[in-house]
Each structure stands twice: as structure tokens, then as C-alpha cells.
């Protein structure tokens, strides 16, 4: 603990305070040295929250205070660094996750700002896969909101440590303590208050001006009137000023007592220090408490809580300190799941859960980081995002898990087995790339020039500058894949003129490469292109990007729910298709799947391939190939320019297209169908035949198999959602009636939120026993959310009836009701209802 005058004016985050426990320095690492920071001093963090909680604003303040930018971007002005897409700036929301690297107090922080809207959940999912820690932004007025709870649980499932920042403390109706209590009860976590809000009275209102630092027993007051950029801070030592600031001192004392009690139940060192200090809470060294908080946070036993107002530029700097102090470095995170599978998977397929895999030797070296296959020179990286840059073309974001990815090196994509040469590796600053010599273990970077060779979820391996051959094990290494949620909404898209079609298709391919949760199906017979996405806003943004950003001349029809067709009765008949006078043959039969394909018995069979979309399975066993094909391969008489693996992939492509062309009822894509390949043939020794013949035959045989079934053998499926509606008890009756009648919902339960919390008694008890300061701003807060007597209506609802539901819910509840939905699966739809829609 350092000693300064009772009131010390601090014009900026000055170095002498940094040496005593606060990081108040604006002197940061020069850009060339930033990439040389060790893994131990690196933090990979994500900013996660509900929409409009202040994620992007908080990120912009972090950039400014770190010295990365010289001015602060503003969401309302549309000049933020991380929201760089025109659609993001015009709407004031985050659509794509953006990566940026900043310095802070001799550390490096890689930040990913993620979207908050449910339509862009996939952006959050793929970002979480490469993070070591998260900052959860909470709106102090709204409290813990639906999307916050959902993203929190996603991070929790991946065991990612989190810290919380209660934002918007300057707003009328802000409730710091109420929000923290919700964090404990709803998010099921213990907390320690690292700082609490500090108010000064102005007439009859309490004005948020700073924070009370619990660890160092000081008031930090931001003098915004003197420096609008939030760098003029007054520091008040409460130990010396406890007479003049008695109320603040007592709050700090009670919060510190609560902190020690919480940490004492986790770390014995805190109990020992408490006893050594004669049971005086204020005498326990802050270094011991800080170390205990860090250990408890990294082990996911505690969530450190900070507060502030990013918009008013108050208390963002202590949050940055918290990121460095409490979130883990790449050397302190759980070892990622790494397997080796010799099967190569196309981008239209899923890796089966029961694929033959072998474990890969991995160890965490305290200095070098992760070492894979006992080879310190082996680099293993995960591609988690692809975007198109205005001047540099296709850029692939990756996280290095072991080794270093250097410029001018060769990598292998273990999904395809293809070798790729990398000229440069880059760091990203919003949408601006910065070339560097290498990206070391634990860091996030970008590569270019991989337009059609790398997709989201691919694992890349390299030996760096060392010239040596890759072993079979190394080229089969795979990091845990990134799951892509199914698209739920459709919209047909068409060019304004025939001459606009080619550019339209190029633009669509660009968007799909960037966003795997966006799908496209082309009906060549009808000349119709169908785009599928996660929601109405998702497809609306796609339209805006195509028309406004890419200048494509297109017309996008009304967005509709994504219905599918399926086979309700299996076809025992084997259907044949042949091309080129019988030289090319494919024979198949059709079956149906009940439930997720990966959990069915079909997935266990030899040769089963789970298609990426629509829960379909293709069974292509080795014995289905004509005998001469396998003989030619074993006897080395193979002359075809296509390998056996490539021919199998062509068959899969043809079958996939055949299923996407739709069923007989409404021409909707087929869902939950098993296509069993009984036999196939292709000349591989003598006469050269185009592989397109095999592609056409594979597609044709599926179409013929479908056409031979009577229409009564098909039914239509629609997406069903698990819906939770949060309302006051006074509105519950009308909400339930509306859900049951207008939305065709099946109400499964009605829960009292307090009873729901009681089901997790420990969290409820923890929240009640936790000391929390008084919420001054709630006295005058007309906009505060009323969390008393809250009800949760749980229902299963057809997605078609939930389109536009939010506006109806707000009308019923006077703007207070909220809801969230999770995809349950596809179920049989009532045909008259479908035709009416």
C-alpha cells in the first residue's frame, strides 16, 4: 500500500502510482515491440454482453487509454474502430467480431469485440473458441439480460474465466448492487467487488463521479468537467481521509470484509494473512488479496466485479488493470482438446463424433507454452474467422496454440491435407492489418492469400522456418471444431438483370466464406437462389451489404422461416442412374432419421458421412465402389487424374445438391434423410471420363429416388424453439393467452423467478449474505427495471409464429417484457398452416 496526500490531483495515469498498485501510465509499448511481449504477459479476451450494454463503447475507451488511438470513436457518430462495416456504423450495432491488439502497463491485450444480437450468435461462438478470458459488460439499468445469460453459459461451458463490468452507472435507475445480486443468482457465480461506485450529491441527486477501490482503500474521482477525455483523476486515500469521507470508508471496510470472507473460503493464504494481521481486514496486504482473486478467477471459482461508465469515460482504466491482474495468460489456460484423425473432411461435411481418432501427446511448458507431439518446433493454429479486406483480399484470423507462425513459411491444412505457402502474417487493428515477422504461441493474427483453401474451424500446422517433412500424425491433427448452428430463415435473391447474375454470385460466395452460418441453395431448374440465415436481422444485414457495400444489383424477397421436407417412410427400392453409356453408375436407397444425425445409429456405420447442413447422412462404404476400382488402387493400375478420395467427395457433392433441390411437396430442401450408396462405378484405368459425369449421376440418382416415392411418403418440417418469456405477474395472463392462441405455443411451465433462484439455493444464499452498497441512483430512477414478482413463461413455439414477436410482447407489457429463444429442432408442420404462411 502506498501513501499519498489525502487528496492528490492526478492529471493522467501517472507512472508513480502505477508502481504502487495502479496502472495510470499512458506510456505504452511501441508498436514494433508489442509483438515481442511474452506469452506470460499476454491476454486474449473477448467483450461479451447483451445488445446495447456498451461493449463497443467500452472497447473504444480501452483503445484510447492504451494509446492505441488518439481519439475516441463514438457508436452514435459511426466512427468506431471495431465497428468498421458501413452496416455497423449506420445501425450502431456490432455485426462482426473485430480483433485488435493494445498495450497496457507492459502487457499485451488481444481484444475481440463481439456482437450482442442473437442473430449473430455464431460470431460469438467462434470467438469464444480462441479466448482465454472474457469481460462481461452489464447494463446497470437493465441488469442481467437474456443474451448476457446465454453468452455467459457458453463461456462457462468452455471454462473461460470472466470478469464483470457494471456499465452505465451514470444513468438514472442504475442499480449496481441489484445487478451484482443478479449476477450471483442468475449466472451462478461467487463475486468479489474490486471497486464500487462513488457518488457526490448535486442538489437532490446522487451523481456518479468515480469508484472506491476496495483493494487499495482509495477513492478515484474522475474530473470530467476539467478533462472530458477522462484522464484527470483525483485520488483520495481513505485511510487518511476517513474522518472527512466516513461513509465511503465504512463502505470500503464492509466490502473488504466481504471480499476476505469470500476469498478465505477458497484460498488458505487469505486466512493465514488475516490471522497474521490480528484479524484486521484493512491490514491484509493488497498483494495477497490480488493473488487470491487471480487464482480464484482463473479456476472459475470467483468473478471479479468492476463498475463505471464507458460513455462518460469513468473507470475504464481500472477495468484494464483487472484484465491484466485477474484474467489468465495463454500459459495458464486449460490444454485444448487435440485429436488426430486420418479422414479428410470437405467443407460440406461434419466430422463424426465417433470417427477413429488417436490422442496426440501435449504438454504445457511454463515458458514456451503448449508443446504438441513432443515437438517444440511444431506450430498448431486454429482458423476461427474469414473476412474480405478492401485491398488485401481474403484474410483468415487464427489463434496460435503452439509454436510460432512465421512469414514466408509453409503450412498444412489438416482438414484437406493441402500445403499452403504464407508470405506474410499480420496483426489487426480494427480493419487495418499490420505486418509482423511472426505470431507466437497464445496470440491472434491474420494470414492472406488463402481464398478457397481455409475455412472457419480448420487446423493449420507448420514447422516454421525449419525444413522438414510432416509426419502422418502431424498432418492429421485437429483442434476441437467450431459448431455452426442451423439457419432458421430464408429469403430468395435474384439479380435485377441476367447480366448481374455473375457478380451477384461472386458477392454471395464472399459473404458465405466470411459467415458459415449463412447458407445458399440454388435451384437450377427454377433459376432460383435461396439465402438462409440465423434471423430476420441477419438476412437484412446481408441485403444491405450486397446492395450498399458491394454494389450488387439484386432483389431480396421477404424473409421467411426456413421450412424443410423429409422422407417419412423409407424407400427400400434401389434406384440407379448412369452416364456415358453405363461407364459411370450410382445406385442409392433412401431412409429417414429421427433426431440428430450424430446421435443416430446411422452415424456409427462404416462410411457414414454427416453432411454439414440439414441433418442429412450419406452412407458411402468402401465396398460400394466397383471391385475394379479398389483393385486398380491396390495393384497400382490407377490412371485417373482423380484420387479415390476425390471421387468420393464428388459423389457427396452430387448427393448434397440433389437433396438441396427439394422434395415434391413445395420443393423445399430435404432434411433428416439418409442416402445409402449401394454401388458406384467410374473408369479409373482406361478411357478418360469427366468427373462431372459422376457429379451429374450422383445428383440425378437422388432426384429419381425422390420422384419414385409417392407424395404421401413426405412431410414438411418446421423449426421449433424453446422460448422463455420474462414478464411481470400483472402481464403474465395476457402473455400466456397470446402465446397459446396467436403463437401456437405449448406452454411447458410458468416459473416464479425467485423460485427459480431458490432451486440453486447456494447462489441465493450467497447473494443474500454478500455485502452490497446502497443503490443511490435507483431512488430517482424512473427507468429502472422492476425485478420483483417476475415470472418466466417457458414454452415450445413454432418459429413461424414468433416472427416479429418482440413488438407484440412490448405492447402487452408496456415495454418491460423480454424473451429469448433457443433452437430445439425440426418437427412436423401442419400443411394448411404452412400454405397460409
UniProtKB/Swiss-Prot annotation:
Would I find Mitochondrion among this entry's keywords? yes
The record's listing under InterPro entries reads:
EF-G-like_DII, EFG2, EFG_II, EFG_III, EFG_III/V, EFG_V, EFG_V-like, G_TR_CS
Keywords associated with the record: GTP-binding, Mitochondrion, Nucleotide-binding, Protein biosynthesis, Transit peptide
Where is each tr-type G domain found?
Answer: 40-331
Q: Where is this region: Disordered?
A: 338-359
Q: Where is the composition biased (Basic residues)?
A: 345-355
Q: What subcellular compartments does it reside in?
A: Mitochondrion
Q: Where does GTP bind?
A: 49-56, 113-117, 167-170
| Any one GO biological process | mitochondrial genome maintenance
CDD domains for this protein: EF-G (cd01886), EFG_III (cd16262), EFG_mtEFG_C (cd03713)
Q: Name one Pfam family in it.
A: EF-G_D2
- List GO terms (cellular component aspect): mitochondrion
Query: GO terms for molecular function, please?
Result: GTP binding; GTPase activity
Q: Which domain of life is it from?
A: Eukaryota
Transit peptide per record: 1-29
PROSITE patterns noted in UniProt: G_TR_1, G_TR_2
Task performed by this protein:
Mitochondrial GTPase that mediates the disassembly of ribosomes from messenger RNA at the termination of mitochondrial protein biosynthesis. Not involved in the GTP-dependent ribosomal translocation step during translation elongation.
Task: Provide the family line.
Answer: Belongs to the TRAFAC class translation factor GTPase superfamily. Classic translation factor GTPase family. EF-G/EF-2 subfamily.
| Protein's recorded name | Ribosome-releasing factor 2, mitochondrial
Amino acid at each position: 500500500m502506498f501513501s499519498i496526500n489525502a487528496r492528490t490531483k492526478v492529471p493522467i495515469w501517472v507512472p508513480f502510482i502505477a508502481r504502487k498498485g495502479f496502472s495510470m501510465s499512458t506510456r505504452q509499448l511501441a508498436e514494433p515491440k508489442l509483438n515481442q511481449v511474452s506469452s506470460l504477459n499476454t491476454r486474449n479476451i473477448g467483450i461479451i454482453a447483451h445488445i446495447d450494454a456498451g461493449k463497443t463503447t467500452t472497447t473504444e475507451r480501452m483503445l484510447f487509454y492504451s494509446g492505441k488511438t488518439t481519439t475516441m470513436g463514438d457508436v452514435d457518430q459511426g466512427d468506431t474502430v471495431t465497428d468498421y462495416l458501413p452496416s455497423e456504423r449506420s445501425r450502431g450495432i456490432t455485426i462482426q467480431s473485430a480483433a485488435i491488439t493494445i498495450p497496457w502497463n507492459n502487457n499485451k491485450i488481444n481484444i475481440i469485440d463481439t456482437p450482442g444480437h442473437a442473430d449473430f450468435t455464431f460470431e460469438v461462438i467462434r470467438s469464444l473458441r480462441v479466448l482465454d478470458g472474457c469481460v462481461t459488460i452489464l447494463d446497470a439499468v437493465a441488469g442481467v439480460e437474456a443474451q448476457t445469460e446465454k453468452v455467459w453459459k457458453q463461456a462457462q461451458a468452455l471454462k473461460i474465466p470472466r470478469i464483470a463490468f457494471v456499465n452505465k452507472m451514470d444513468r438514472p435507475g442504475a442499480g449496481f448492487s441489484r445487478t451484482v445480486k443478479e449476477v450471483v443468482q442468475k449466472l451462478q457465480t461467487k463475486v468479489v467487488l474490486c471497486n464500487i461506485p462513488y457518488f457526490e450529491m448535486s442538489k437532490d441527486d446522487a451523481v456518479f463521479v468515480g469508484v472506491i477501490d476496495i483493494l487499495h482503500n482509495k477513492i478515484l474521482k474522475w474530473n470530467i468537467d476539467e478533462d472530458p477525455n477522462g484522464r484527470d483523476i483525483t485520488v483520495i486515500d481513505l485511510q487518511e481521509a476517513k474522518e472527512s469521507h466516513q461513509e465511503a470508508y465504512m463502505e470500503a471496510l464492509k466490502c473488504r470484509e466481504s471480499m476476505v470472507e469470500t476469498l478465505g473460503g477458497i484460498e488458505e493464504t487469505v486466512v493465514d494473512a488475516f490471522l497474521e494481521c490480528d484479524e484486521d481486514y484493512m491490514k491484509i496486504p493488497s498483494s495477497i488479496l490480488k493473488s487470491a482473486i487471480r487464482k480464484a478467477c482463473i479456476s472459475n471459482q470467483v468473478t471479479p466485479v468492476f463498475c463505471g461508465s464507458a460513455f462518460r469515460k469513468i473507470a475504464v482504466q481500472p477495468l484494464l488493470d483487472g484484465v491484466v491482474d485477474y484474467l489468465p495468460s495463454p500459459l495458464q489456460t486449460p490444454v485444448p482438446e487435440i485429436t488426430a484423425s486420418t479422414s479428410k473432411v470437405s467443407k460440406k461435411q461434419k466430422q463424426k463424433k465417433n470417427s477413429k481418432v488417436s490422442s496426440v501427446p501435449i504438454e504445457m511448458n511454463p515458458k514456451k507454452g503448449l508443446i504438441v507431439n513432443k515437438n517444440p518446433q511444431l506450430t498448431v493454429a486454429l482458423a476461427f474467422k474469414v473476412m474480405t479486406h478492401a485491398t488485401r483480399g481474403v484474410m483468415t484470423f487464427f489463434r496460435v496454440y503452439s509454436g510460432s507462425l512465421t512469414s514466408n513459411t509453409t503450412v498444412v491444412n489438416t482438414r484437406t491435407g493441402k500445403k499452403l505457402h504464407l508470405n506474410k502474417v499480420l496483426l489487426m487493428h480494427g480493419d487495418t492489418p499490420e505486418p509482423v515477422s511472426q505470431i507466437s504461441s497464445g496470440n491472434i493474427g491474420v494470414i492472406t492469400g488463402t481464398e478457397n483453401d481455409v475455412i472457419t474451424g480448420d487446423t493449420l500446422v507448420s514447422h516454421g522456418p525449419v525444413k522438414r517433412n510432416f509426419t502422418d500424425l502431424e498432418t492429421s491433427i485437429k483442434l476441437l471444431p467450431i459448431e455452426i448452428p442451423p439457419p432458421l430463415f430464408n429469403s430468395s435473391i435474384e439479380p435485377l438483370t441476367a447480366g448481374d447474375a455473375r457478380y451477384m454470385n461472386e458477392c454471395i460466395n464472399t459473404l458465405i466464406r466470411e459467415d458459415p452460418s449463412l447458407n445458399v441453395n440454388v435451384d437450377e431448374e427454377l433459376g432460383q437462389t435461396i439465402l438462409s440465415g440465423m434471423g430476420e436481422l441477419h438476412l437484412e444485414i446481408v441485403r444491405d451489404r450486397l446492395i450498399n457495400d458491394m454494389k450488387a444489383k439484386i432483389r431480396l424477397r421477404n424473409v421467411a422461416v426456413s421450412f424443410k421436407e423429409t422422407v417419412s417412410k423409407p424407400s427400400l427400392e434401389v434406384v440407379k442412374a448412369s452416364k456415358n453409356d453405363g461407364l459411370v453408375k450410382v445406385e442409392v436407397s433412401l431412409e429417414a432419421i429421427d433426431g440428430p444425425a450424430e446421435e443416430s445409429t446411422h452415424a456409427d456405420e462404416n462410411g457414414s458421412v454427416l453432411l454439414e447442413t440439414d441433418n442429412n447422412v450419406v452412407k458411402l462404404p468402401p465396398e460400394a465402389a466397383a471391385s475394379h476400382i479398389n483393385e486398380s488402387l491396390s495393384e497400382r493400375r490407377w490412371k485417373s487424374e482423380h484420387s479415390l478420395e476425390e471421387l468420393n467427395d464428388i459423389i457427396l457433392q452430387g448427393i448434397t445438391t440433389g437433396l438441396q433441390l427439394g422434395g415434391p411437396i413445395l420443393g423445399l430442401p430435404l432434411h433428416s434423410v439418409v442416402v445409402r450408396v449401394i454401388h458406384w462405378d467410374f473408369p479409373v484405368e482406361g478411357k478418360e471420363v469427366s468427373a462431372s459425369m459422376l457429379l451429374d449421376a450422383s445428383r440425378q440418382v437422388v432426384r429419381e429416388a425422390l420422384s419414385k416415392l409417392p407424395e404421401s411418403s413426405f412431410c414438411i418440417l418446421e423449426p421449433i424453439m424453446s422460448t422463455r418469456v420474462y414478464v411481470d405477474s400483472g402481464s403474465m395472463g395476457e402473455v400466456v393467452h397470446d402465446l397459446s392462441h396467436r403463437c401456437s405455443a405449448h406452454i411447458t411451465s410458468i416459473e416464479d423467478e425467485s423460485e427459480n433462484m431458490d432451486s440453486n439455493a447456494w447462489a441465493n444464499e450467497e447473494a443474500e449474505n454478500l455485502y452490497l452498497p446502497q443503490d443511490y441512483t435507483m431512488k430517482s430512477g424512473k427507468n429502472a427495471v422492476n425485478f420483483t414478482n417476475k415470472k418466466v413463461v417457458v414454452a415450445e413455439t413454432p418459429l413461424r409464429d414468433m416472427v416479429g414477436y418482440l413488438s407484440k410482447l412490448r405492447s402487452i407489457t408496456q415495454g418491460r417484457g423480454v424473451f429469448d429463444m433457443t433452437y430445439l429442432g425440426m418437427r412436423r408442420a401442419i400443411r394448411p398452416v404452412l400454405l397460409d404462411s
